[in-house]
UniProtKB/Swiss-Prot annotation:
InterPro entries: Chorion (IPR002635). Residues 72-142 are annotated as: Central domain. Keywords: Repeat, Signal. It comes from Bombyx mori (Silk moth). One of its GO terms (cellular component) is egg chorion. This is Chorion class CB protein M5H4. Belongs to the chorion protein family. This protein is one of many from the eggshell of the silk moth.
Amino acid sequence: MTTIVVLICASALFVQLAFSQCLGRDPVIGFGGAYGSGWGGYDAISPYDGLGYGVPYSAGFIGLSPSNLAASCGGALAVNSLSPTTPTGLTVASENTIEGNLGIFGQLPFLGAVATDGAFSTGGIGAVLYGCGDGAIGIVSEAPIVAPASIGYGQWPVNAGYKGIGPCGCGGLY
């Protein structure tokens, strides 16, 4: 029985190690004393501000800052492959007959080669232009993520934004 419990706990630990990502935290703004004034950690025992997970002088976002949510920030997710065979890649194929001028552009998820196969008319030309950009490998199409504006924690008695603490949120501007 002990072996089964240890095996289940070890499996849960390995799953958490494989699928977890640290997004960090930003400071709580507005309080004095142990909570600081928005320039440090949000508790008295931890001055952690998540360097690399948000600006030290945060713009008032409690929790995750927008820079934490982009796929290109916050460190890399490690990918390990222990397959006995090499991946063969990704194939994008079209069985259509295409006549006239054709321009195809887009993003493929891995570095690789481009090949054309099929019958080309002798009166036209066929060319493949291939470039590997800035080294970003993957299906990446990002736009800036804008978080809702936050009033933040104010002074007592209003305390949590312009509406105070109540059933309708804490007064963020959505």
